Amino acid sequence: MLSPQTISYKTLLEKAWPIILANASVPLLGLVDTTVIGNIGTAQDLGAIAFGALIFSFVYWGFGFLRMGTTGFAAQADGAGDQEEVRAVLARSLLLAIGLGLFLILLQWPIKQAAFSMLSGSESVEKVAQSYFSIRIWGAPATLCTFALMGLLIGLGNSGQLLIVQLFLNGLNIILDIWFAGFLEWGAQGIALGTVIAEWATVAFASVLIFRELSRREICETAFFPIKKLRDRGPFVKLLSANADIMIRTLILVFSFAYFVNRSSSFGDVSLAANHILLQLISFAAFFLDGYAFVVESVVGSALGSKQNKMFDSAVKKSTILAACTALILAAALWIFGGFIIAGLTDISAVRFEAVKFLPLASAYIFLSFAAFQLDGIFIGASFTREMRHAAMLSIIIFLVACRFLIEPFSMFGLWWAMVLYVVARAAALLLFYPRLRAAVGL
């Protein structure tokens, strides 16, 4: 059990690094898929995977609330020592995940039609991509259940097991993709089938890990899922409300990046390509900052559940210092070595020149983003989701207003300044609600 005395920098780092590795392992899967199809499949297969992966990434990102909502409530229940409620949190989240997953399957035709109406590819690519979609959609319930299961592991502070689950998912997926697409030459359909099988296998694997973990805590004296607690609608309504708030916040975040990319395209193909590269570097930095945010979600939730105010303050202070130092190192590294990194990512001189020109602003974004990541983690751990929704709404308004007044006179520099202002506004908006959070939890 964590305490103010055991919340050391070493402890936080030990909890963060498995999460960072788990996050960083995700792009490896896409790289392997691309390599397999790029060497064995057709151009249509490669294009189909690009389209299909984009659609599912967008859809599943919108359901990220299942992970975040589960983490906060599980951490609080675990901190309070209410292990029966931990199981109830898991059950509610899994029921919601299964329901939403089945809903996606039922609506697969309109989702597919809407998605492909917004994408412009050749007829042959779209035909293969639709086949890919029709197979992968059957993994939706499994993917959403995995979000809930991973959320529980984070809430319980088991970042090591989270890494194991993520490596199992990616490792099995890679093996199946190589087998189906590489050896059997099933192309994009083989990639989709391998992904679906891996997703369902991961649900089973993670469920076994969690069952053993909860059994180790000797909390299975009665039925594993407490039916009596599940009949109480209050906590389920609370979970639905929290998840709705997080979903709105997430969709606003998705919109902000989509808007940034769309405005980038108005400056030409070179500017769009340059900003795409810089956003990939920002995404890489997010793997590290997310690690600390996930840890603070767990520790803050546990501290509030156990009513250890000193533990809350210690966790917030030390994890924020670590995140700030990490962000500074990442930003400095990008500023100093960014030119070499960009040169390795593209040999198009115009794109390289354009990307290097905005390296300082991309570096500033990375450094200043640590506060938004940390505050997100604190608010998720405390289940203060309504305030997260309000903060997201406020910050996107600031971003759009900044774009309105900065882009015309300053062109692409204005767009980047607006983006940097946006990440600062995200943190500032959450800080407005931070005193309310502390007061509500008795700090």
List the predicted regions and their residue ranges:
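Short runs within selected transmembrane alpha-helices of multi-pass transporters and secretion channels
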Residues: R67, I135-I154, L162-N170, I191-S207, ...
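Helix-terminus/linker motif at the lipid-water interface of multi-pass membrane proteins
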Residues: L28-G47, F116-E123, W179-W186, M247, ...
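Short alpha-helical transmembrane segments in multi-pass integral membrane proteins
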Residues: M1-A16, A74-P141, F183-M247, V300-Y365, ...
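Small-residue-rich hydrophobic transmembrane alpha-helices
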Residues: L46-L106, T143-L162, A274-G338, F370-S383, ...
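Transmembrane helical elements of multi-pass membrane transporters/channels
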Residues: E14-D33, I135, T146, L169, ...
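Transmembrane alpha-helix boundary and packing residues in multipass membrane permease domains
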Residues: I19, N23, T35, G72, ...
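Alpha-helical transmembrane segments of multi-pass membrane transport proteins
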Residues: K10, S25-V26, F63, L104, ...
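Membrane-helix boundary and inter-helical linker elements of multi-pass secondary transporters
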Residues: N39-T42, Q76, G155, L184, ...
